Amino acid sequence: MTIEYKKEEKIAVFTINNPDVLNALSPAEVAEWTANLIDFREDKNLWVGIVTGAGEKAFCTGLNLRTAGGGGPPPGGQRGPAPSAPPAPQETLVKGLKLWKPLIAAVNGYAFGGGFEIALACDIRLAAENARFGLTEVTLGLIPGWGGSQRLPRMIPFGKAAEMLLMGKRIDAQEAFNLNLVSKVVPQKDLMATAKEWANQICNCAPLAVWTAKEAMMRGIDMTLADGLNLEGELGRKVMASKDFAEGRKAFMEKRTPNYIGE
């Protein structure tokens, strides 16, 4: 399987395992991963996910152009249909899939094109020292199609986003850290251990509260402040009625570690 999906107690680990093509993805593999993400979303025993790439060279380099096809005319001929490939699902991690469980991107190498866009669609990004980032689609005659043109200018200064989008400029892990695109840069050998450490810190919190906090952020970011505050209040009332809040309050009073269940 190109997308390895492992369940390690409360943590789901997704590994893009296609190193011969720098962990690029075909439309069929995007569909496979989306099915795994839906399983992760619905599994109440899984609280947080980690996304990484196999090997030490590439995290993901986006869509595999050899399998995706293209709309240009063949040499010496008229424009024809793109080579057949299984269609990608309408809802994916990068577009449309509602997923309130947090995802950590453990960027172990090249994150170019759609691979960078996958990392941008995650909630927290950690990077190995050798990681590289870039929206390189314009160098191939394309524009970002997995959300890069929309997410990146919302995350970093517009001018820097323009450099990356309009010039296909690549940046290293330290510059990504300086731009707050990644939360921490670590040696390659420590990357997955660090990602799991951060995931476990999330798992120490009440899962329903974590998922609802992410929902509040994601839904509220495009709202007016007034509408966002109303949303926060609505979601806050939901978690205040939860078993986890009752357990958290009881554990606080009894000075013990809470036993959260996600309800």
Task: Give the location of each predicted region.
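Crotonase-fold acyl-CoA enzyme core
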Residues: 94-208, 234, 241-242, 246-247, ...
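An acidic, glycine-rich surface segment that forms the CoA-thioester-binding/catalytic face
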Residues: 30-38, 42, 65-108, 140, ...
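C-terminal alpha-helix plus adjacent terminal tail
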Residues: 1-9, 43, 56, 67, ...
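Short, active-site-adjacent cap segments at secondary-structure transitions
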Residues: 56-60, 66, 112
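Conserved CoA-thioester-binding segment of acyl-CoA-metabolizing enzymes
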Residues: 1-56, 69-70
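Conserved catalytic-core motifs of eukaryotic protein kinase domains, centered on the activation segment
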Residues: 61-62, 130
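Terminal peptide-recognition signature
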Residues: 14, 18, 32-33, 51, ...
